[in-house]
A protein has these predicted regions:
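NAD(P)-dependent Rossmann-like dehydrogenase/reductase catalytic/cofactor-binding core
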Residues: 2, 206-273
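Short pre-catalytic strand/loop immediately N-terminal to key active-site residues, enriched for Gly-Thr
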Residues: 117, 166-171, 223-228
Length: 273
């Protein structure tokens, strides 16, 4: 087969969402991509939708891809790496989005001087609004790093960090959308309790979160400053904030990020080796 720029192993929800954004943003041409998934029906459907090549197996994909994006669950990445290592060359680059799987863990399967890029993104990649963090090993050059950054800029913002921080990124922005959905749902429940319809309550709550986030990013003001702009003396907002503080909302969110971070670290434990 003709050499491909990008091979994607795993075309589940995130893998297919990334593929969609890569192509629709014109970051990479469809005929420069090859994909593989253990679910052949899904693989065929995605191939037909985006007009991309499919591989018969992992080995075939690796042999003809310059960059290999591994988009599988951490629980099965060892099995994938066992197959990848048999045909991987030192000129290729591995890109992994498996949560909690460190570069050193991958290196135990890939002893060669292969460039490894670890990615932590999140579910808003589905609509091109992801928050993505990238970490690399010493074998990744500027060209390879630029390729990965350009890919993931097509799904949102990208930051480069030392790998030691990626588990915290997992706890904050990786799991963060779920926290925000709970907050939106709870705000909507409050609206319903006070007499608004469910539909209107969800719409208002979601737009409030979206608008507040945009205001923060565009003004670059500290969130506390923006909060104080809304909380006027003896007003409704400061009264509500008092309730949130009494219920220890801040501490609960901090503990949630901490718990998810520790769980991410544990995913690379001996149970996966």
């Amino acid at each position: 087969m003709i050499k491909k720029e990008l091979g994607i192993i795993g075309i589940g929800k995130i893998g297919s969402a990334l593929l969609r954004r890569f192509i629709n943003s014109n970051t990479i041409n469809h005929d420069n991509i090859i994909i593989y998934d253990i679910n052949y029906d899904r693989l065929k459907a995605i191939s037909n939708e985006f007009d991309v090549s499919i591989a018969k197996n992992i080995a075939e994909l690796v042999k003809i891809s310059n960059y290999i994006l591994i988009a599988v669950l951490p629980q099965v990445i060892n099995t994938v790496l066992e197959e990848v290592k048999e045909v991987l060359s030192e000129q290729q680059v591995l890109i992994s989005i498996a949560a909690g799987i460190t570069i050193n863990h991958i290196k135990t399967f890939i002893p060669k001087s292969v460039g490894i890029i670890r990615i932590m993104t999140n579910s808003p990649a589905l609509i091109g609004e992801a928050a993505t963090a990238i970490a690399i090993n010493k074998d990744v050059n500027e060209k390879d790093l630029s390729f990965a950054k350009n890919l993931f800029r097509s799904v949102g913002i990208v930051v480069e960090l030392d790998e030691i921080h990626l588990d915290a990124v997992t706890g904050l922005s990786g799991s963060g959308p779920a926290y925000i959905f709970i907050i939106i749902e709870a705000l909507a429940d409050g609206g319903v309790k006070m007499g608004l319809s469910r539909e209107i309550s969800i719409k208002l709550a979601a737009q409030t979160v979206l608008g507040s986030a945009k205001l923060l990013l565009e003004t670059k003001k500290h969130p506390g400053e923006l909060k104080d702009m809304v909380a006027t003396p003896a007003g409704t907002t400061i009264t509500a904030i008092h309730e949130l503080e009494s219920a220890k909302l801040r501490a609960t969110l901090i503990r949630a990020v901490e718990a998810a971070t520790l769980k991410s670290r544990s995913l690379n434990s001996s149970s996966f080796k």
